[in-house]
Amino acid sequence: MSEFAPICIYLVISLLVSLIPLGVPFPFASNSSTYPDKLSAYECGFDPSGDARSRFDIRFYLVSILFIIPDPEVTFSFPWAVPPNKIDPFGSWSMMAFLLILTIGSLYEWKRGASDRE
């Protein structure tokens, strides 16, 4: 148990650091001052016009996916940024397979017209 003591202490401290800020506002919060204006949607000082839950076109989601693709690519490319003589063949081929999958996905989205604006 003594070899796990630092891990347990770290776990307790990290839980306290993350849970205390969540619990501190509750004793100071009051439910008596709820105004309907505070609960309404804000539209530049005007009364809300229309429903706030309108439908979005699926193209917005496709564009967001296009922006998400480079994030894992960069993240998984960092370990590959070592001198070429330090990478074994498995690491080299696995990175090539990863880049091939990303390239195929990007070509698929391009062919489907995800970046086209109509």
UniProtKB/Swiss-Prot annotation:
Main localisation: mitochondrion
Pfam families per the UniProt record, alphabetical: Oxidored_q4
Keyword line: Electron transport, Membrane, Mitochondrion, NAD, Respiratory chain, Translocase, Transmembrane, Transmembrane helix, Transport, Ubiquinone
EC number: 7.1.1.2
Ranges that cross the membrane: 4-24, 87-107
Annotated localization: Mitochondrion membrane
GO molecular function: NADH dehydrogenase (ubiquinone) activity
Annotated Gene Ontology cellular component terms: mitochondrial membrane; NADH dehydrogenase complex
InterPro entries: NADH_UbQ/plastoQ_OxRdtase_su3, NDAH_ubi_oxred_su3_sf
Membrane topology note: Multi-pass membrane protein
ATP-binding keyword on record: no
Catalysed reactions, as listed in the record: a ubiquinone + NADH + 5 H(+)(in) = a ubiquinol + NAD(+) + 4 H(+)(out)
Domain of life: Eukaryota
Functional description taken from the UniProt entry: Core subunit of the mitochondrial membrane respiratory chain NADH dehydrogenase (Complex I) that is believed to belong to the minimal assembly required for catalysis. Complex I functions in the transfer of electrons from NADH to the respiratory chain. The immediate electron acceptor for the enzyme is believed to be ubiquinone.
Family from the record: Belongs to the complex I subunit 3 family.
Protein name according to UniProt: NADH-ubiquinone oxidoreductase chain 3
Species: Panax ginseng (Korean ginseng)
Gene symbol of the encoding locus: ND3
